[in-house]
Amino acid sequence: MEKLRRVLSGQDDEEQGLTAQVLDASSLSFNTRLKWFVICFVAGIFFSFLGTGLLWLPNGMKLFAVFYTLGNLAALASTCFLMGPVKQLKKMFETTRLLATIIMLLCLVFTLCAALWWRKKGLALLFCILQFLSMTWYSLSYIPYARDAVLKCCSSLLG
């Protein structure tokens, strides 16, 4: 219907940018986006808990690192369904969350490197902890004044 309105009003598809055309062609209904958000988010939680359970098995560090990272990636992908991938990427790299985004993405990569290539269990566990903390800090950036509240709580506890 929107395309018909654009054609009737004199706006051609040629006037739209390529990105807008691709996003228009691949847009999902709100119900579909909500369903996929829930599916990805639940899968992310499942993979994270599965990875945590595998940590206690003999030689389970590799599986822990892989599944925990996969869980975080699925949780991150879930928000792409709510706001769209382009908008999500733009928000991720805004100045308010740029540092948290970079640290989070580096920790995802370093967790896998430490577990799979470097074979350093302690380092993989450290990167998983940093991954959790950076993902939490990144998520708090979407809630107004949440970071300030956390900083005030931590500073009052420490001194």
Curated annotation (Swiss-Prot):
Main location: membrane
Gene Ontology annotations for the cellular component aspect, listed alphabetically: cytoplasm; endomembrane system; intracellular membrane-bounded organelle; membrane
GO biological processes: protein transport; vesicle-mediated transport
Keywords recorded for this protein, A-Z: Membrane, Phosphoprotein, Protein transport, Transmembrane, Transmembrane helix, Transport
Intervals, Cytoplasmic compartment: 1-36, 84-97, 144-159
UniProt feature coiled coil, ranges: none
Segments passing through the bilayer: 37-57, 63-83, 98-118, 123-143
Record keyword Nucleotidyltransferase present: no
Topological type in the membrane: Multi-pass membrane protein
Residues recorded as bearing Phosphoserine in the entry: 9
Ranges per topology, Lumenal: 58-62, 119-122
Localization per record: Membrane
Matching InterPro entries: Vesicle_transpt_Got1/SFT2, Vesicle_transpt_SFT2
Keyword Protein transport set for record: yes
Highest taxon, organism lineage: Eukaryota
Family membership noted in the UniProt record: Belongs to the SFT2 family.
Database matches in PANTHER family: VESICLE TRANSPORT PROTEIN SFT2A, VESICLE TRANSPORT PROTEIN-RELATED
Role according to the record: May be involved in fusion of retrograde transport vesicles derived from an endocytic compartment with the Golgi complex.
Protein name, per record: Vesicle transport protein SFT2A
Gene name in the database record: Sft2d1
